[in-house]
Amino acid sequence: MSKKDRKIILIAQCLVNPYCRVHILGQNFPLSHELMNYLMEKRVGIIQYPCPETTAMGLKRNPQGRQQYYNIFFRNHCKELLKVPMLMVREFIRSNYRLVGYIGLENSPTCGIHWGEHNVNRYNTESPNPVEQPEPNEPVLMGIMAEILSEELNKEGNYAPFLELPVKEPAESAKRKMFWEELIKNVEPYGKEV
C-alpha cells in the first residue's frame, strides 16, 4: 500500500455532465471543466452518482422545489440510485482512501446543501426560486438526495464535508471564491502538493 494521500470525492452528475441540469440553472460547461481539471490535477478519484431528477422525470422537466420531491417515492428512488456509489465509497474507504467531500449544486432541491425559504408558485407549491429576504427563523434543509447521502454516510460513521457549487454566480463572486477555498482546504489539507 502506498503512503500517498489517496482521495475520492462524491459529486452530483450535473457537475460532470451539465446537460442533466434543469434549464433554469444553466449549463455552464466552463465551470464543470474547471472543476474536473482541478480534481484530476490533484489526483482525486470522482464518484459520480446519477441525477435523481433526470432518472425520475427525464431531461424535459419543469423546475420544481424541494416540497414536490419530498415524498416517499422520490426518497426511495434516491436511495436506490445511491446503492452502487455508496458501495464504491465503502470499498475505497476500506482500501484506505480518504473521502474529501461531497459536491452538490447550489439551489438544487435534490443535491443542494442549503435549501431555505422559496417563493410559492401559482399552484401554491414551492418554486425553485429562493425568497430574496428569507425569514431569519426559516429552517435551512439539504436537498433530498444530499440529505439521504448524509444519512447513509452518518450510519457508517463516515464524515465528509458537504460543499455546494454556486453555478449561477460569477467566477469572481464571494460565494464562488468561498467554494474554491473550502474545496482546496479539504483536498489539500497539508498545503500545496509537490
Predicted regions span which residues?
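Short amphipathic alpha-helices and their capping/turn segments at secondary-structure boundaries
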Residues: 1-4, 31-45, 84-100
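Residues lining hydrophobic/aromatic ligand-binding pockets adjacent to catalytic sites
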Residues: 2-7, 18-30, 114, 118-121, ...
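A structural signal for short, well-ordered beta-strand segments and their strand-loop junctions
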Residues: 10, 46-50, 98-105, 161-166
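Extended cationic-aromatic binding surfaces that line active-site or macromolecule-binding grooves
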Residues: 14
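Short catalytic/ligand-binding loop motif for oxyanion handling, primarily in non-cytosolic enzymes
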Residues: 18-19, 56-58, 108-114, 171-174
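Short, surface-exposed acidic-centric catalytic microdomains
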Residues: 27-69
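Divalent-metal-activated hydrolytic enzyme cores
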Residues: 59-67, 71-94, 127-194
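Internal, conserved structured core segments that host functional sites
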Residues: 98-122, 134, 148-149
